[in-house]
Amino acid sequence: MLNDSVPAHVLVRSRRIYSTSPDGAMLGAIAIRGDSIVAVARESNSLDSLITPTTCVIDDPTLTWLPAFYDTHNHLLEATRNATFVPVNRARTVAELVSLIREQAARTPAGRWIQTSNAWHERKLAEGRLPTAQELDLATRDHPVILRRGGHMAVLNSRGLEASGITAATPDPPGGRLGRLADGTLDGMLEGGAQYALVHVPPLPIEEQIAGVEQSCRMFTASGIGTVRDPVVSPEGMRLYQAAAEAGRLSLRVRPMLLMFPSGSVAARIAQIEGFAMRSGFGNEWLKVWGLKFVMDGGPEGGALDEPYVTDASFRGHLNWDPEEMFAVMTAAVQRGWRVGTHAIGDRAVRTVLDIYERIIMANPRLPAGMFVIEHAFLADTTERARAIRMGVHITVQHALLHALGASLLRLWGPDRTRPIMPVKAWLDEGADLSAGSDYPIGFYEPVRTIWGMVTRQTETVGIQGPEYAIDRETALRLTTVAGARLSGEPNCLGPLAPGRFADLVAFRADPITCEIDRLPELKPVMTIVGGRAAFDPEAMFASKAAMSVGKL
């Protein structure tokens, strides 16, 4: 396919360029002008007529090129904690974790909050548990401390509890739980939505926040990611993204989801939606609002199950939202043009969310396609999968969660409910619309590791879980690239390497599709191009002639 009326700013030649187009074409050349692909060809020299004296030609037959990855569930703003806050992932004991916080306290003015990164898990500690408020007090009593783990667990020290107004008399908030010792004393643990409902940490200065976003973007583009869908963004987070975009410091595309809390009246939550003064699709090619995020249940410790937890016969997890209230708020959202994505991992949560979606669709039969998504859907049997497929509900899956949380899931849910978690092959065989991501910072973020994980179903510490749900590499590649374009409603500008699409592509020295499977998770890109410019180029293969300015809202 050739458009010889326009010269190329960049020409890529290689023997192996995976287009991921429906016909599975392998390309030999791609011509880029500005931020878009203008021509592709199967022969490497077929586009040479588009070369001018200023064209940047990247001619390396040993490289394998793919579309840049689209991580459809990546907490980019949360990832900035890893660059900014206490790196507790280095600790291997509770004492080491406390020591890291103590070191930060020595450099921090008294009274100022100390926060930790959340890309870690207590399974890495010798004690295999979260520390208590009393243990965090050993680090400092002069600073409020919040120790975050992933998006669903946190621990405060005593000063943090005091600063947040949390006492032994404080009731559990909707969708959350306060941890207590046997005598009723608070142990500092905040499960589920408790940290979001009860703790309000002052933000860092805006320049520090923008620098953190910029550093996270560089980390992700170095792994080949060109677009992320950030599933938990507050209005303040949205303003941060806008500031970063306006400053030209987004090196990848972001599709934010504004988070809806389960607290407050239905009328107040509908008023909140109306107050956003935007809706799905607002923005430009670099920063565009995807929709709203609802959270129906928790993580492995709080996912809403039909049957009791292995560790507690009286506990089946909890639903964060009253179903009738979610129905009312969600109906108002979709009627105002908002897409909705809902976190649901337990079978009871998945079924309840599908019940709500079905009621909304029946009451609003003219809604456009692509309005409803379930994030994760850990447990979905044949009946619920069929319902989701019939309603056109998109499912986002993240093998990194099974990889990182396998041991916890086995302990809490048991083997019969761990093996079929995120049954990707079953979903696809039955006709579901799926896309893949990482849910970083809970698990790994590298897309090649996501592909490896979906092919092997391997976990970090408890072996292979559910091998019957594994898929092949080319299918996994599509789930980590072009599937995201469908989810975003942008199939004409993102996705396959084809004329008219954005020039978002990534190069590897080895072929991720054909290399030995054990080598796959260790592969590193040598270049990532986003919007026709080098977002990652450690070997300086890309000439600055083709550089473009970042679009602004």
PLM region descriptions:
Residues 331-341, 345-372, 376-377, 382-514, ...:
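His/Asp/Glu-enriched, well-ordered alpha-helical/loop segment
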Residues 284-304, 391-403:
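Non-cysteine beta-strand/loop elements that form the S-adenosyl-L-methionine
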Residues 117, 148, 398, 506-509, ...:
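Residue-level recognition of conserved beta-strand edge/terminus positions
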Residues 244-248, 277-287, 388-392:
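Acidic (Asp/Glu)-rich catalytic clusters
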Residues 2-14, 18, 22-274, 290, ...:
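Divalent metal-binding segments
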Residues 514, 534-545:
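Short, charged low-complexity linker/loop segments at the C-terminal edge of domains
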